[in-house]
Protein backbone atom coordinates (compact mmCIF):
# COMPACT_ATOMS: atom_id res chain seq x y z
CA UNK A 1 0.00 0.00 0.00
CA UNK A 2 1.25 3.50 -0.80
CA UNK A 3 0.06 6.98 0.09
CA UNK A 4 1.15 10.11 -1.77
CA UNK A 5 0.42 13.57 -0.38
CA UNK A 6 1.01 16.79 -2.31
CA UNK A 7 1.15 20.00 -0.28
CA UNK A 8 1.06 23.31 -2.16
CA UNK A 9 1.41 26.78 -0.68
CA UNK A 10 -0.52 29.82 -1.87
CA UNK A 11 1.69 32.20 -3.79
CA UNK A 12 4.79 30.00 -3.47
CA UNK A 13 6.56 28.31 -6.40
CA UNK A 14 7.19 25.02 -4.62
CA UNK A 15 5.29 21.92 -3.53
CA UNK A 16 6.10 19.25 -0.98
CA UNK A 17 5.66 15.58 -1.90
CA UNK A 18 5.43 12.87 0.75
CA UNK A 19 5.42 9.23 -0.23
CA UNK A 20 4.59 6.55 2.32
CA UNK A 21 4.84 2.86 1.59
CA UNK A 22 3.31 0.20 3.88
CA UNK A 23 4.08 -3.51 3.72
CA UNK A 24 0.59 -5.01 3.93
CA UNK A 25 1.76 -8.55 3.24
CA UNK A 26 2.76 -11.37 5.56
CA UNK A 27 6.21 -11.53 3.97
CA UNK A 28 9.28 -9.33 3.87
CA UNK A 29 9.20 -6.67 1.17
CA UNK A 30 12.50 -6.15 -0.63
CA UNK A 31 12.48 -2.81 -2.43
CA UNK A 32 14.45 -3.07 -5.66
CA UNK A 33 14.11 0.61 -6.52
CA UNK A 34 11.81 3.55 -5.86
CA UNK A 35 12.15 6.42 -8.33
CA UNK A 36 10.21 9.58 -9.17
CA UNK A 37 10.73 11.32 -12.51
CA UNK A 38 10.13 15.03 -13.07
CA UNK A 39 10.19 15.46 -16.84
CA UNK A 40 10.55 18.54 -19.02
CA UNK A 41 7.69 17.26 -21.20
CA UNK A 42 5.17 14.45 -21.29
CA UNK A 43 7.15 12.63 -23.98
CA UNK A 44 10.49 12.81 -22.18
CA UNK A 45 12.20 9.54 -21.30
CA UNK A 46 14.49 9.27 -18.28
CA UNK A 47 16.08 6.08 -17.01
CA UNK A 48 17.39 5.29 -13.56
CA UNK A 49 20.79 4.34 -14.93
CA UNK A 50 23.61 6.42 -13.45
CA UNK A 51 26.47 7.48 -15.68
CA UNK A 52 29.90 7.22 -14.01
CA UNK A 53 31.39 10.67 -13.42
CA UNK A 54 35.14 11.05 -13.21
CA UNK A 55 35.35 13.89 -10.73
CA UNK A 56 37.81 13.99 -7.84
CA UNK A 57 36.66 16.53 -5.28
CA UNK A 58 38.76 15.33 -2.35
CA UNK A 59 37.67 14.59 1.19
CA UNK A 60 36.72 17.43 3.50
CA UNK A 61 39.03 16.32 6.30
CA UNK A 62 38.66 19.52 8.33
CA UNK A 63 34.88 19.39 8.29
CA UNK A 64 34.76 23.07 7.39
CA UNK A 65 34.44 23.03 3.61
CA UNK A 66 37.82 24.69 3.14
CA UNK A 67 38.98 22.80 0.04
CA UNK A 68 39.01 25.29 -2.83
CA UNK A 69 38.13 24.52 -6.45
CA UNK A 70 39.30 26.23 -9.63
CA UNK A 71 37.24 26.04 -12.84
CA UNK A 72 38.78 29.05 -14.56
CA UNK A 73 40.41 26.82 -17.20
CA UNK A 74 37.62 24.23 -17.35
CA UNK A 75 35.32 24.42 -20.38
CA UNK A 76 33.15 21.44 -19.42
CA UNK A 77 31.04 19.62 -20.23
CA UNK A 78 31.03 19.05 -16.44
CA UNK A 79 32.09 21.43 -13.70
CA UNK A 80 32.56 20.68 -10.01
CA UNK A 81 32.72 23.52 -7.50
CA UNK A 82 32.31 23.92 -3.75
CA UNK A 83 30.55 26.94 -2.33
CA UNK A 84 29.08 29.84 -4.28
CA UNK A 85 32.25 31.73 -5.29
CA UNK A 86 32.57 30.24 -8.79
CA UNK A 87 28.87 29.94 -9.62
CA UNK A 88 28.60 33.18 -11.63
CA UNK A 89 31.53 32.14 -13.81
CA UNK A 90 30.20 28.62 -14.38
CA UNK A 91 26.68 29.89 -15.14
CA UNK A 92 28.15 31.81 -18.07
CA UNK A 93 29.88 28.68 -19.35
CA UNK A 94 26.80 26.46 -18.87
CA UNK A 95 24.14 28.48 -20.70
CA UNK A 96 20.59 27.59 -19.66
CA UNK A 97 19.41 28.09 -23.26
CA UNK A 98 21.31 24.90 -24.10
CA UNK A 99 20.03 23.11 -20.96
CA UNK A 100 21.95 23.34 -17.71
CA UNK A 101 21.95 20.31 -15.40
CA UNK A 102 22.94 20.36 -11.74
CA UNK A 103 23.19 18.03 -8.77
CA UNK A 104 24.34 19.31 -5.40
CA UNK A 105 25.05 18.04 -1.93
CA UNK A 106 26.38 19.79 1.13
CA UNK A 107 28.07 19.37 4.45
CA UNK A 108 29.05 22.95 5.21
CA UNK A 109 29.50 24.57 1.80
CA UNK A 110 27.43 23.05 -1.00
CA UNK A 111 29.26 21.00 -3.63
CA UNK A 112 27.80 21.49 -7.13
CA UNK A 113 28.25 19.24 -10.15
CA UNK A 114 27.10 21.27 -13.15
CA UNK A 115 26.64 20.04 -16.71
CA UNK A 116 26.28 22.08 -19.88
CA UNK A 117 24.43 21.17 -23.08
CA UNK A 118 22.20 18.76 -21.15
CA UNK A 119 25.12 16.63 -19.95
CA UNK A 120 24.00 14.05 -17.38
CA UNK A 121 25.18 14.63 -13.82
CA UNK A 122 24.31 12.55 -10.77
CA UNK A 123 25.11 12.01 -7.12
CA UNK A 124 24.71 8.93 -4.93
CA UNK A 125 24.63 8.72 -1.14
CA UNK A 126 25.50 5.38 0.41
CA UNK A 127 27.42 4.16 3.45
CA UNK A 128 30.79 4.70 1.76
CA UNK A 129 29.85 8.30 1.01
CA UNK A 130 28.94 9.01 4.63
CA UNK A 131 32.04 7.54 6.27
CA UNK A 132 34.26 9.76 4.12
CA UNK A 133 32.51 12.98 5.08
CA UNK A 134 33.44 14.95 8.19
CA UNK A 135 30.07 16.14 9.44
CA UNK A 136 29.84 17.80 12.84
CA UNK A 137 26.21 18.97 12.80
CA UNK A 138 23.32 17.90 14.98
CA UNK A 139 21.95 15.85 12.11
CA UNK A 140 18.33 15.99 13.26
CA UNK A 141 18.52 19.75 12.76
CA UNK A 142 20.70 19.78 9.66
CA UNK A 143 23.22 17.53 7.95
CA UNK A 144 23.29 19.07 4.49
CA UNK A 145 21.20 19.31 1.39
CA UNK A 146 20.76 16.99 -1.58
CA UNK A 147 19.20 18.28 -4.78
CA UNK A 148 19.02 18.14 -8.56
CA UNK A 149 18.12 20.97 -10.92
CA UNK A 150 17.07 21.17 -14.56
CA UNK A 151 16.95 24.53 -16.34
CA UNK A 152 16.45 25.40 -20.01
CA UNK A 153 15.64 28.62 -21.82
CA UNK A 154 11.96 28.50 -20.85
CA UNK A 155 11.64 26.95 -17.38
CA UNK A 156 13.49 25.45 -14.49
CA UNK A 157 12.85 23.23 -11.51
CA UNK A 158 14.91 21.80 -8.69
CA UNK A 159 14.13 18.81 -6.49
CA UNK A 160 15.44 18.50 -2.92
CA UNK A 161 15.25 15.24 -0.97
CA UNK A 162 14.63 15.88 2.72
CA UNK A 163 17.33 14.49 5.02
CA UNK A 164 18.74 12.34 2.26
CA UNK A 165 22.06 11.60 3.95
CA UNK A 166 20.35 10.51 7.13
CA UNK A 167 17.98 8.26 5.17
CA UNK A 168 20.48 6.72 2.74
CA UNK A 169 20.61 5.18 0.16
CA UNK A 170 19.59 8.04 -2.11
CA UNK A 171 20.48 9.26 -5.58
CA UNK A 172 19.54 12.11 -7.89
CA UNK A 173 20.36 12.79 -11.50
CA UNK A 174 19.72 15.58 -13.95
CA UNK A 175 19.86 15.11 -17.71
CA UNK A 176 18.56 16.65 -20.92
CA UNK A 177 15.06 15.25 -20.28
CA UNK A 178 14.58 16.24 -16.63
CA UNK A 179 15.34 14.91 -13.17
CA UNK A 180 15.23 11.48 -11.51
CA UNK A 181 14.76 11.32 -7.73
CA UNK A 182 15.79 7.93 -6.41
CA UNK A 183 14.42 7.38 -2.92
CA UNK A 184 15.74 3.84 -3.28
CA UNK A 185 18.34 3.64 -6.06
CA UNK A 186 18.80 0.21 -7.60
CA UNK A 187 21.85 -1.88 -6.66
CA UNK A 188 23.11 0.58 -4.05
CA UNK A 189 21.84 -0.86 -0.75
CA UNK A 190 19.36 -3.54 0.22
CA UNK A 191 16.15 -2.22 1.76
CA UNK A 192 13.95 -4.89 3.34
CA UNK A 193 10.71 -3.88 5.04
CA UNK A 194 9.23 -6.34 7.51
CA UNK A 195 5.54 -7.21 7.47
CA UNK A 196 3.49 -4.35 8.88
CA UNK A 197 6.28 -1.81 8.54
CA UNK A 198 5.83 1.63 6.94
CA UNK A 199 8.18 4.36 5.76
CA UNK A 200 7.45 7.94 4.74
CA UNK A 201 9.89 10.07 2.74
CA UNK A 202 9.55 13.54 1.29
CA UNK A 203 10.99 15.89 -1.29
CA UNK A 204 10.34 19.41 -2.55
CA UNK A 205 9.89 20.51 -6.16
CA UNK A 206 10.84 24.16 -6.64
CA UNK A 207 9.73 25.71 -9.93
CA UNK A 208 11.75 28.73 -11.00
CA UNK A 209 12.54 30.95 -13.97
CA UNK A 210 15.64 30.42 -16.14
CA UNK A 211 17.00 33.68 -14.75
CA UNK A 212 17.13 32.48 -11.14
CA UNK A 213 20.71 32.25 -9.91
CA UNK A 214 22.08 28.96 -8.66
CA UNK A 215 22.87 30.44 -5.26
CA UNK A 216 19.18 31.30 -4.86
CA UNK A 217 18.15 27.76 -5.82
CA UNK A 218 20.69 26.42 -3.32
CA UNK A 219 19.37 28.79 -0.65
CA UNK A 220 15.80 27.53 -1.00
CA UNK A 221 17.05 23.94 -0.87
CA UNK A 222 18.98 24.60 2.34
CA UNK A 223 15.98 26.29 3.95
CA UNK A 224 13.89 23.21 3.13
CA UNK A 225 16.41 21.10 5.03
CA UNK A 226 16.53 23.46 8.02
CA UNK A 227 13.33 25.53 8.23
CA UNK A 228 12.62 28.03 10.96
CA UNK A 229 11.11 26.54 14.10
CA UNK A 230 8.64 28.42 16.32
CA UNK A 231 9.82 29.42 19.76
CA UNK A 232 7.75 29.83 22.90
CA UNK A 233 9.44 30.95 26.10
CA UNK A 234 9.50 28.36 28.92
CA UNK A 235 7.59 30.70 31.23
CA UNK A 236 4.71 30.70 28.71
CA UNK A 237 4.56 26.91 28.80
CA UNK A 238 4.61 27.04 32.59
CA UNK A 239 1.76 29.55 32.79
CA UNK A 240 -0.32 27.65 30.22
CA UNK A 241 -0.16 24.44 32.24
CA UNK A 242 -0.25 22.28 29.12
CA UNK A 243 2.62 20.11 30.35
CA UNK A 244 3.60 18.64 33.67
CA UNK A 245 5.50 21.13 35.78
CA UNK A 246 9.13 20.67 34.74
CA UNK A 247 9.86 24.38 35.05
CA UNK A 248 11.86 25.11 38.22
CA UNK A 249 11.87 28.54 39.81
CA UNK A 250 15.66 28.43 39.93
CA UNK A 251 17.73 26.42 37.47
CA UNK A 252 20.77 24.41 38.56
CA UNK A 253 23.52 24.73 35.96
CA UNK A 254 25.10 21.34 36.64
CA UNK A 255 21.74 19.61 36.35
CA UNK A 256 20.85 21.44 33.13
CA UNK A 257 24.23 20.66 31.59
CA UNK A 258 23.75 16.99 32.47
CA UNK A 259 20.29 16.86 30.87
CA UNK A 260 21.51 18.56 27.69
CA UNK A 261 24.49 16.21 27.49
CA UNK A 262 22.21 13.19 27.76
CA UNK A 263 19.94 14.52 25.01
CA UNK A 264 22.77 15.52 22.68
CA UNK A 265 24.77 12.37 23.37
CA UNK A 266 22.14 9.92 22.15
CA UNK A 267 23.52 7.67 19.45
CA UNK A 268 22.38 8.26 15.89
CA UNK A 269 21.88 5.46 13.40
CA UNK A 270 21.72 6.37 9.73
CA UNK A 271 19.77 4.61 7.03
CA UNK A 272 16.30 4.75 5.52
CA UNK A 273 14.79 2.37 8.09
CA UNK A 274 17.06 3.34 11.00
CA UNK A 275 17.05 7.13 11.18
CA UNK A 276 15.30 8.22 14.37
CA UNK A 277 16.17 5.08 16.31
CA UNK A 278 19.27 3.68 17.97
CA UNK A 279 20.91 0.35 18.72
CA UNK A 280 20.92 -0.55 22.41
CA UNK A 281 24.37 -2.00 23.07
CA UNK A 282 23.36 -3.34 26.48
CA UNK A 283 20.51 -5.41 25.07
CA UNK A 284 22.70 -6.45 22.15
CA UNK A 285 25.56 -7.85 24.25
CA UNK A 286 23.03 -9.62 26.49
CA UNK A 287 22.04 -11.61 23.42
CA UNK A 288 18.46 -10.37 23.21
CA UNK A 289 18.79 -10.11 19.44
CA UNK A 290 20.27 -13.57 18.97
CA UNK A 291 23.63 -12.06 18.07
CA UNK A 292 22.18 -9.23 15.99
CA UNK A 293 21.90 -5.55 16.99
CA UNK A 294 18.85 -4.78 19.12
CA UNK A 295 17.00 -1.58 18.24
CA UNK A 296 15.70 0.36 21.23
CA UNK A 297 12.47 1.44 19.46
CA UNK A 298 12.64 4.75 21.32
CA UNK A 299 12.52 3.16 24.76
CA UNK A 300 11.22 4.75 27.08
CA UNK A 301 9.41 7.48 25.15
CA UNK A 302 12.54 9.41 24.20
CA UNK A 303 10.44 11.79 22.05
CA UNK A 304 8.44 12.88 25.12
CA UNK A 305 11.66 13.67 26.97
CA UNK A 306 12.75 15.78 23.98
CA UNK A 307 9.43 17.65 23.99
CA UNK A 308 9.81 18.44 27.69
CA UNK A 309 13.38 19.63 27.10
CA UNK A 310 12.25 21.90 24.28
CA UNK A 311 9.46 23.36 26.39
CA UNK A 312 11.67 23.99 29.40
CA UNK A 313 14.66 25.42 27.49
CA UNK A 314 13.42 26.77 24.16
CA UNK A 315 16.45 25.14 22.49
CA UNK A 316 15.49 24.39 18.90
CA UNK A 317 17.38 21.12 18.42
CA UNK A 318 15.31 19.33 21.07
CA UNK A 319 12.21 19.90 18.95
CA UNK A 320 14.03 18.46 15.93
CA UNK A 321 15.03 15.43 18.01
CA UNK A 322 11.33 15.00 18.82
CA UNK A 323 10.23 15.27 15.19
CA UNK A 324 12.80 12.82 13.79
CA UNK A 325 12.30 10.16 16.47
CA UNK A 326 8.49 10.45 16.37
CA UNK A 327 8.42 10.03 12.60
CA UNK A 328 10.48 6.86 12.86
CA UNK A 329 8.22 5.64 15.66
CA UNK A 330 5.03 6.19 13.65
CA UNK A 331 6.43 4.31 10.66
CA UNK A 332 8.81 1.60 11.81
CA UNK A 333 8.03 0.89 15.46
CA UNK A 334 4.25 0.49 15.06
CA UNK A 335 2.48 -2.45 13.41
CA UNK A 336 0.39 -1.24 10.45
CA UNK A 337 -0.65 -4.68 9.23
CA UNK A 338 -0.86 -8.15 10.75
CA UNK A 339 -3.02 -11.25 10.60
CA UNK A 340 -2.93 -11.15 14.41
CA UNK A 341 -5.45 -8.57 15.74
CA UNK A 342 -3.43 -8.22 18.97
CA UNK A 343 -0.69 -6.53 16.95
CA UNK A 344 -2.59 -4.02 14.82
CA UNK A 345 -1.73 -0.49 15.86
CA UNK A 346 0.54 -1.63 18.67
CA UNK A 347 4.16 -0.72 19.31
CA UNK A 348 6.95 -3.27 19.09
CA UNK A 349 9.21 -3.94 22.04
CA UNK A 350 12.95 -3.45 21.44
CA UNK A 351 14.13 -6.21 19.12
CA UNK A 352 16.49 -7.05 16.29
CA UNK A 353 15.39 -5.78 12.89
CA UNK A 354 13.17 -3.14 14.54
CA UNK A 355 10.17 -5.46 14.62
CA UNK A 356 11.38 -8.84 13.37
CA UNK A 357 10.36 -11.60 15.79
CA UNK A 358 9.11 -8.84 18.08
CA UNK A 359 6.52 -8.94 20.83
CA UNK A 360 4.04 -6.44 22.22
CA UNK A 361 3.56 -5.84 25.93
CA UNK A 362 2.08 -2.92 27.85
CA UNK A 363 5.45 -2.06 29.39
CA UNK A 364 6.80 -1.06 25.98
CA UNK A 365 3.96 1.01 24.58
CA UNK A 366 3.67 4.73 25.25
CA UNK A 367 1.93 7.70 23.67
CA UNK A 368 2.94 10.98 25.30
CA UNK A 369 5.72 11.69 22.80
CA UNK A 370 3.34 11.11 19.89
CA UNK A 371 0.82 13.51 21.39
CA UNK A 372 3.61 16.06 21.88
CA UNK A 373 4.56 15.63 18.23
CA UNK A 374 0.94 16.20 17.19
CA UNK A 375 0.66 19.32 19.35
CA UNK A 376 3.88 20.84 18.01
CA UNK A 377 3.47 19.97 14.33
CA UNK A 378 -0.26 19.57 13.70
CA UNK A 379 0.48 16.26 11.94
CA UNK A 380 -2.58 14.17 12.80
CA UNK A 381 -0.66 10.97 12.24
CA UNK A 382 0.81 11.53 15.69
CA UNK A 383 -2.64 11.65 17.25
CA UNK A 384 -3.96 8.69 15.23
CA UNK A 385 -0.92 6.57 16.08
CA UNK A 386 -1.32 7.32 19.78
CA UNK A 387 -4.99 6.29 19.64
CA UNK A 388 -3.99 3.05 17.88
CA UNK A 389 -1.45 2.24 20.58
CA UNK A 390 -4.05 2.92 23.25
CA UNK A 391 -6.49 0.56 21.56
CA UNK A 392 -3.78 -2.09 21.48
CA UNK A 393 -3.06 -1.62 25.20
CA UNK A 394 -6.75 -2.15 25.98
CA UNK A 395 -6.69 -5.42 24.03
CA UNK A 396 -3.52 -6.63 25.74
CA UNK A 397 -4.95 -5.91 29.19
CA UNK A 398 -7.66 -8.48 28.45
CA UNK A 399 -5.11 -11.27 27.93
CA UNK A 400 -4.29 -13.80 30.71
CA UNK A 401 -0.90 -12.21 31.45
CA UNK A 402 -2.53 -9.28 33.23
CA UNK A 403 -5.41 -10.92 35.07
CA UNK A 404 -3.68 -11.80 38.38
CA UNK A 405 -2.18 -8.93 40.44
CA UNK A 406 1.54 -9.47 41.05
CA UNK A 407 2.14 -11.98 38.25
CA UNK A 408 3.61 -9.25 36.02
CA UNK A 409 6.10 -6.63 37.15
CA UNK A 410 5.00 -3.16 38.24
CA UNK A 411 5.97 -1.45 35.01
CA UNK A 412 3.61 -3.56 32.87
CA UNK A 413 0.37 -2.10 34.17
CA UNK A 414 2.22 1.05 35.21
CA UNK A 415 2.97 1.98 31.62
CA UNK A 416 -0.54 0.99 30.60
CA UNK A 417 -1.95 3.37 33.22
CA UNK A 418 0.31 6.18 32.02
CA UNK A 419 -0.74 5.63 28.40
CA UNK A 420 -4.45 5.46 29.14
CA UNK A 421 -4.35 8.49 31.44
CA UNK A 422 -2.60 10.55 28.75
CA UNK A 423 -5.22 9.53 26.19
CA UNK A 424 -8.05 10.49 28.53
CA UNK A 425 -6.48 13.92 29.07
CA UNK A 426 -6.11 14.31 25.30
CA UNK A 427 -9.57 13.09 24.25
CA UNK A 428 -11.79 13.38 27.34
CA UNK A 429 -13.17 9.98 26.31
CA UNK A 430 -14.22 7.91 29.32
CA UNK A 431 -13.42 4.63 27.57
CA UNK A 432 -9.77 5.10 28.54
CA UNK A 433 -10.70 5.24 32.24
CA UNK A 434 -12.31 1.81 32.52
CA UNK A 435 -8.99 0.01 32.66
CA UNK A 436 -7.39 2.84 34.66
CA UNK A 437 -9.69 2.16 37.60
CA UNK A 438 -9.05 -1.57 37.18
CA UNK A 439 -5.26 -1.03 37.26
CA UNK A 440 -5.46 1.16 40.37
CA UNK A 441 -7.51 -1.54 42.07
CA UNK A 442 -4.94 -4.17 41.06
CA UNK A 443 -2.12 -2.11 42.54
CA UNK A 444 -4.04 -2.02 45.82
CA UNK A 445 -4.59 -5.78 45.81
CA UNK A 446 -0.96 -6.31 44.85
CA UNK A 447 0.25 -4.26 47.82
CA UNK A 448 -2.14 -6.01 50.20
CA UNK A 449 -1.02 -9.48 49.11
CA UNK A 450 2.76 -8.94 48.97
CA UNK A 451 3.17 -6.09 51.42
CA UNK A 452 4.79 -4.00 48.68
CA UNK A 453 4.96 -3.96 44.86
CA UNK A 454 7.24 -6.97 44.53
CA UNK A 455 7.90 -8.60 41.15
CA UNK A 456 8.27 -12.30 40.28
CA UNK A 457 11.93 -13.04 39.59
CA UNK A 458 13.35 -16.54 39.99
CA UNK A 459 11.08 -19.50 40.68
CA UNK A 460 11.57 -19.03 44.41
CA UNK A 461 11.86 -15.24 44.82
CA UNK A 462 9.88 -12.07 44.47
CA UNK A 463 11.97 -8.91 44.59
CA UNK A 464 11.85 -5.15 44.44
CA UNK A 465 12.82 -3.77 41.05
CA UNK A 466 13.31 -0.12 41.91
CA UNK A 467 13.24 1.07 38.33
CA UNK A 468 9.93 -0.64 37.58
CA UNK A 469 8.35 0.47 40.84
CA UNK A 470 9.32 4.05 40.00
CA UNK A 471 7.52 3.72 36.65
CA UNK A 472 4.41 2.54 38.45
CA UNK A 473 4.65 5.42 40.93
CA UNK A 474 5.02 7.95 38.12
CA UNK A 475 2.00 6.52 36.34
CA UNK A 476 -0.21 6.43 39.42
CA UNK A 477 0.90 9.99 40.14
CA UNK A 478 -0.32 11.11 36.71
CA UNK A 479 -3.68 9.48 37.35
CA UNK A 480 -3.85 11.05 40.81
CA UNK A 481 -3.31 14.53 39.37
CA UNK A 482 -6.43 14.11 37.27
CA UNK A 483 -8.48 12.27 39.90
CA UNK A 484 -7.07 13.16 43.34
CA UNK A 485 -8.01 10.66 46.05
CA UNK A 486 -6.48 10.28 49.48
CA UNK A 487 -6.20 6.48 49.23
CA UNK A 488 -4.20 6.81 45.99
CA UNK A 489 -1.99 9.49 47.53
CA UNK A 490 -1.21 7.27 50.50
CA UNK A 491 -0.44 4.31 48.21
CA UNK A 492 2.07 6.46 46.29
CA UNK A 493 3.73 7.61 49.51
CA UNK A 494 4.01 4.05 50.83
CA UNK A 495 5.64 2.90 47.58
CA UNK A 496 8.18 5.73 47.66
CA UNK A 497 8.90 5.13 51.36
CA UNK A 498 9.52 1.46 50.55
CA UNK A 499 11.91 2.40 47.73
CA UNK A 500 13.79 4.81 49.97
CA UNK A 501 14.07 2.28 52.78
CA UNK A 502 15.07 -0.75 50.72
CA UNK A 503 16.59 0.46 47.42
CA UNK A 504 18.51 3.60 48.42
CA UNK A 505 22.29 3.19 48.64
CA UNK A 506 24.82 5.11 50.72
CA UNK A 507 26.19 6.87 47.62
CA UNK A 508 22.84 8.54 46.99
CA UNK A 509 21.73 6.31 44.12
CA UNK A 510 18.90 3.81 43.89
CA UNK A 511 19.79 0.33 42.73
CA UNK A 512 18.00 -1.19 39.76
CA UNK A 513 16.86 -4.40 41.44
CA UNK A 514 17.48 -6.39 44.59
CA UNK A 515 18.86 -9.53 42.95
CA UNK A 516 21.38 -10.64 42.00
Spans of model-derived segments:
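Low-complexity, Ser/Thr/Pro/Gly-enriched N-terminal "stalk/linker" regions
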Residues: 213, 219-290, 334-342
Amino acid sequence: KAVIKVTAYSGKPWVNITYRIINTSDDELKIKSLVFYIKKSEDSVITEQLKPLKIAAGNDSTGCGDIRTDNSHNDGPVFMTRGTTELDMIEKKADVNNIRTVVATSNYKTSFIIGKNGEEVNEVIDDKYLVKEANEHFAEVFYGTFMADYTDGEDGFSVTVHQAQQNYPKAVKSCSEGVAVMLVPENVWEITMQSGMAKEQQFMIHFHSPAMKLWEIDNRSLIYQMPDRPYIAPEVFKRAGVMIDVFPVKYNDDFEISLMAKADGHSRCYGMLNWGDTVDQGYTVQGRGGGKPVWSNNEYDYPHACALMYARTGVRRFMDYLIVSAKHWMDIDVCHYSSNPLRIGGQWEHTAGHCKNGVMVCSHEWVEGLLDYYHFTGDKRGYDTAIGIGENVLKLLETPMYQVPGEANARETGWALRTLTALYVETNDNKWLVKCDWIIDNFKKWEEEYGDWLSPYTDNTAIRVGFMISIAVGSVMRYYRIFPREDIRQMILRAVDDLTENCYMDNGLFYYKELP
